[in-house]
Design a protein with these regions (language model features):
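Short, polar/flexible loop-turn hinges at active-site or ligand-entry regions and domain interfaces
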Residues: 7-9, 29-31, 47-61, 70-75, ...
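Conserved SAM-binding loop
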Residues: 1-3, 171-180
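P-loop NTPase Walker
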Residues: 1-53
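The start of beta-strands in P-loop NTPase/AAA+ ATPase cores
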Residues: 11, 31, 168-169, 196
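Conserved helicase motor core of SF1/SF2 NTP-dependent helicases
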Residues: 7, 15-19, 35-38, 176-208
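Short, well-ordered alpha-helices that flank and scaffold nucleotide-derived cofactor binding pockets
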Residues: 2-6, 25, 155-162, 184-191
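Accessory N-terminal region flanking or inserted into the helicase ATPase core
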Residues: 76-171, 180-185, 198
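Conserved phosphoryl-transfer catalytic core
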Residues: 41, 51-81, 193-205
Length: 208
């Protein structure tokens, strides 16, 4: 950092909150700051709509509503709900991480199956009804802005084309673990004449 001119704004992308706090505690130069991408996305969302509340169970509640309300389900329907909950949560999360509906069109049936196989998501046998419910859950999740989950902190700012604070130099550690939506955020954080440095090991990549 000492070789970067003091007039240049420097942003360090931290892999998690603890690392960001440690970097800032060390006493970064006045022109540098360290945050997670989730923090960056949440800041952009708050500028757009300050009333959003964070709830990690967002998909769970949406699925329950679409199936008639959890408290109104009989035992059989409740069993179906719990059978569908995990794969729908996983697939909705993957859709957001890859930018479907924001950077890419909604995935085809073949793309859903390919994504599920690649990330070991076990899908139910009743494929047509599952895909319909998955699409409805995803659509409602991406339109519900008053409640957001951790995936939304990254996904919604891109879908809504929100403005990010830009820096002259962006440094990204553990870049092999970035998913497509995170990469898009980093690109939007780079100033017009800015640069980025990505440090990572492709052999440890989560998203390939």
């Amino acid at each position: 950092l000492k070789f970067i001119p003091c007039l240049n704004r420097v942003f360090l992308v931290a892999f998690n909150k603890q690392i960001a706090e440690e970097l800032n505690a060390r006493g970064l130069p006045s022109n540098a700051t360290a945050k997670t991408l989730h923090s960056v996305g949440l800041s952009a969302l708050k500028r757009h709509q300050n009333r959003s509340k964070v709830n990690g169970n967002k998909t769970r509640y949406i699925l329950g509503d679409l199936m008639g309300g959890y408290n109104l389900m009989d035992d059989e329907l409740r069993k179906t709900y719990f059978k569908l909950l995990s794969p729908i949560q996983r697939m909705v999360s993957l859709f957001k991480n890859f930018g479907y509906g924001a950077m890419l069109p909604y995935p085809t049936k073949d793309e859903v199956l390919e994504l599920a196989a690649k990330y070991s998501v076990e899908l139910p046998d009743e494929m047509d009804s599952f895909l319909k419910l998955l699409a409805e859950t995803f659509e409602k999740s991406t339109k519900q802005l008053n409640i957001i989950d951790f995936d939304d902190m990254l996904y919604l700012p891109i879908k809504l084309n929100l403005i990010f604070d830009q820096s002259d130099f962006v440094m990204v550690d553990e870049s092999q673990d970035l998913n497509p939506i995170q990469i898009e955020i980093v690109k939007k954080m780079i100033g017009e004449r800015g640069r980025a440095l990505f440090c990572g090991d492709p052999h440890q990549a989560i998203y390939g």
